[in-house]
Amino acid sequence: MELQQDLIPQKKTIGALDHAVFLCMVFCFWFSGYIYVPVFSLYLEDLHFSYGAIGIILGSYGVTQILLRFPLGLLSDILFSLRKQLLIAGFGFSVLSSLLFLMFDSFFFVLAARLFAGITASTWVMATILYAHYFNNGNASKAMGIMQFFTVMPQFASIVFCGLAAAHLGRQVPFWMALAASAAGLVICCFIQDPSAPPANRGTIRVNQYIKDTLRLPKLKLFTILSMTAHAVLFITVFGFTPLYMNQLGMGDAELLWVMSAFFLPHAAATLSFVFLRFTSRIAYSVMLISFAVTGVCLLYVPFLAALFTVCITHACIGLALGFVFPLLLSHVVEISSARLKMSVMGFYQSFYALGIFLGPLLAGKIAQLIGLAGVFYGAGSLAFAAFFVMLAQKRNMIN
């Protein structure tokens, strides 16, 4: 199979307004996807779904991402003009997902709505690399730091608004807020700039060669495995079973807001630090190694906690640690890929870390059903330590 590909991209001039429009779109992208997440597992429990069914629905968010992120990245590398259109289509699926949540409460339609939300998340690969083109090649860490911050900031904002809305207006109100943010994001997305627009000169390249070149990149599989593990931990706990565990402790939506805030404030601070700091490979390695160790210790400690304060402290430490891990891995992936392969590499990376988003909650749901919610945190902590030992074994490869 052969498709036309641009040989030398001609960059458009990007101004402050272009950055502002793009980041507003990013805010809507994640706000619409996460506004209901803090109470989503509680909402599913209100619908009388079992822990196993809740795990399936939570994990389904990763299914469509596994299937679509790599093909979308590959397709976008070959057909430059589709990048913006695919991102717009992602907002369309977000609108559809919100409508399904509002109109139906059966397992089938709730599952379908979450799958559509996963399709929206799959188009994030377009946004990631489009924004990387807004910066010079030497500023990959800065670009990814800003993107990660504007990923975390709307997630934190969604937690605040979700907690307040759920506590005072009911747990279905966040779905209306998701619908409004999706519609706004769709409109804003129509006005973003694509600085990698195709030139007149075009050549051909085989799709299978693109795939081979992507898979041959050094360290890509290693970074992907580490990211897959970190995302599994995140979606097992904060975006999965932490709210259910707090509910088991007798805490309500107001207390949940405190715990989520404790996680996301240091998480946002850590990601924002990449806008101002530059990390050498050795320092980056040490930071990630310590972060996985801290995450593992805190998660193993969670089942022994019963007070709101201690739950907040442990989640603050987890949030800070993961706040360093995600942008460091993302910037490494951007740096090891050539300009020609950036989208397909990012698609591969995001597609396979979505395995963690899928398998993590799925297995956690089974564990919770068999041995209780404490087992969920033991499993998540074990995953964090597994990543820690992988990094120890690959120290020379990661530093060089």
From Swiss-Prot:
One cellular component term (GO) for this entry is: plasma membrane
Sorted keywords for this record are: Cell membrane, Membrane, Transmembrane, Transmembrane helix, Transport
UniProt keyword Thylakoid present: no
Which superkingdom is the protein from?
Answer: Bacteria
The record's annotation in Pfam families points to:
MFS_1 (PF07690)
Give the UniProt subcellular location, in the record's own words.
Cell membrane
The protein's predominant localisation is: membrane
* Transmembrane region(s): 20-40, 47-67, 91-111, 115-135, 149-169, 172-192, 222-242, 256-276, 289-309, 310-330, 345-365, 370-390
- What is the topology of this protein in the membrane according to its UniProt annotation? Multi-pass membrane protein
Could you identify this protein by its name?
Uncharacterized MFS-type transporter YxlH
